[in-house]
Amino acid sequence: MQSKQAPDTEILVIGGGPAGLHAAFYAAWRGLSVRVLEARGEVGGQLLALYPDKVIYDVPGVPQVRAAELVAALCAQLGPLDVDLRTGEVARTLEPDGTGGWVIGTAGARHRARAVILAAGMGALLPREVRVPGADTHPDVRADLPDPAGFAGRRVLVVGGVPQATRAAVELLEAGATVTLTHRRAGFRGDPLTLARLETARQASQMRLLAPAVLSRLTPQGAELVVEGAPLAVRADTVLILNGYLPDLSPLQAWPLAWDGEYVPDGPSGQTVLPGVYVIGDLARSGGDFKLLSLAFAQAAVAANHAAHHVRPELKMRPGHSSERGGYPVR
C-alpha cells in the first residue's frame, strides 16, 4: 500500500503515554504545532493498557490518583493547543528529509517534522494475537479497544476478564451496543465504579455476563461457548478479544540511535546522536532504571523546550514560569 503524505508538523512525538502527552503539551504551549503518534487505539500508554485502575501515589503534589484519571487530566491539559493526536499508528521508519528535518513512516502515512521526541516507553504496545479456532470465519474480530461510538445497534461479544474488557463492555453498552461479556474465570476485574456499572447493567438485564465460560470457536454468526459444561451459541456482529498487550521495540531499534540495549543514549537536553531527535521516559539512557513518572515529566519538559528552540531559534530556551505567563500559548 502506498503511504500517504500527512501534513507537516513542527514537532512529532512518538508515543502517547504520560511522557509523550506532557512533551506535547509543553511544545504546543510554546506555540508550536505538535503531532502525537500512538500505536494503540487510545492514548495513555502503559497507564491505560496495563493498569488503568491502579492508584499512583508519587505524582508530585497529587497524594493519589488512578492511572486512568491521570491520563484524562493530561489530555484535558492539552486544552485548545495545537496537538494532533493520531492513534493506531506505529512508527516504523526514520529518514532525513533533506532540509534538516525528519520523515517518520507508519504503515499508511509519512509524517514530516522539524524535530522528533521519542516517548515510546517499552515499545509499541500491540494486542496479543487472536488464536481461536474459526477466527478467520467471522467478519469482524478485534483485539484492541475500539471507539465505542461506531457500535450503536450492533451485537458485541467482549471476551476477557482484564480491566480493559470490563471498561470496553460498559462503554460499548453506553454507546448503544448490545453487549455480552464473557471470561474463562469467575468474576471480572476493574475499578469499583466500572464493576458497579457492570452489576447494575446485569441486574437490569441490559448486559449478559457469562463467567466462567470457555470460548470454543468463532463462527460466521458469532461464537460457540461452553458455560457450566453446556454448549452455548452467542450471535455477535463484532467479537472483541482482549488478552492484554506485548511491547515491541523492534521497528525503533533499527533506527541509528546508538542503542544501549533497550535504552537510547541522550545528553542533558534529551537529544540523541541525531540532531533534532530527542528521547524521554523509559527509553532514555539518562534515566537509568528509575522508571518514574516524575522523572519522565521532567525529561518531557526539558526535551520539549530544547526541541522548540531547535525548530524556532528565535524562541528562548527557557519558557519562564507559567504563573507569570498564564493562558495559551507561551512564546
Curated annotation (Swiss-Prot):
<feature type="binding site">
    <location>
        <position position="46"/>
    </location>
    <ligand>
        <name>FAD</name>
    </ligand>
</feature>
<dbReference type="GO" id="GO:0050660">
    <property type="term" value="F:flavin adenine dinucleotide binding"/>
</dbReference>
<feature type="binding site">
    <location>
        <position position="282"/>
    </location>
    <ligand>
        <name>FAD</name>
    </ligand>
</feature>
<keyword id="KW-0521">NADP</keyword>
<dbReference type="GO" id="GO:0050661">
    <property type="term" value="F:NADP binding"/>
</dbReference>
<protein>
    <recommendedName>
        <fullName>Ferredoxin--NADP reductase</fullName>
        <ecNumber>1.18.1.2</ecNumber>
    </recommendedName>
</protein>
<dbReference type="GO" id="GO:0004324">
    <property type="term" value="F:ferredoxin-NADP+ reductase activity"/>
</dbReference>
<dbReference type="InterPro" id="IPR023753">
    <property type="entry name" value="FAD/NAD-binding_dom"/>
</dbReference>
<dbReference type="InterPro" id="IPR022890">
    <property type="entry name" value="Fd--NADP_Rdtase_type_2"/>
</dbReference>
<comment type="subunit">
    <text>Homodimer.</text>
</comment>
<dbReference type="Pfam" id="PF07992">
    <property type="entry name" value="Pyr_redox_2"/>
</dbReference>
<dbReference type="InterPro" id="IPR036188">
    <property type="entry name" value="FAD/NAD-bd_sf"/>
</dbReference>
<feature type="binding site">
    <location>
        <position position="38"/>
    </location>
    <ligand>
        <name>FAD</name>
    </ligand>
</feature>
<keyword id="KW-0274">FAD</keyword>
<keyword id="KW-0285">Flavoprotein</keyword>
<keyword id="KW-0560">Oxidoreductase</keyword>
<comment type="similarity">
    <text>Belongs to the ferredoxin--NADP reductase type 2 family.</text>
</comment>
<feature type="binding site">
    <location>
        <position position="125"/>
    </location>
    <ligand>
        <name>FAD</name>
    </ligand>
</feature>
<dbReference type="InterPro" id="IPR050097">
    <property type="entry name" value="Ferredoxin-NADP_redctase_2"/>
</dbReference>
<feature type="binding site">
    <location>
        <position position="323"/>
    </location>
    <ligand>
        <name>FAD</name>
    </ligand>
</feature>
<feature type="binding site">
    <location>
        <position position="91"/>
    </location>
    <ligand>
        <name>FAD</name>
    </ligand>
</feature>
<feature type="binding site">
    <location>
        <position position="51"/>
    </location>
    <ligand>
        <name>FAD</name>
    </ligand>
</feature>
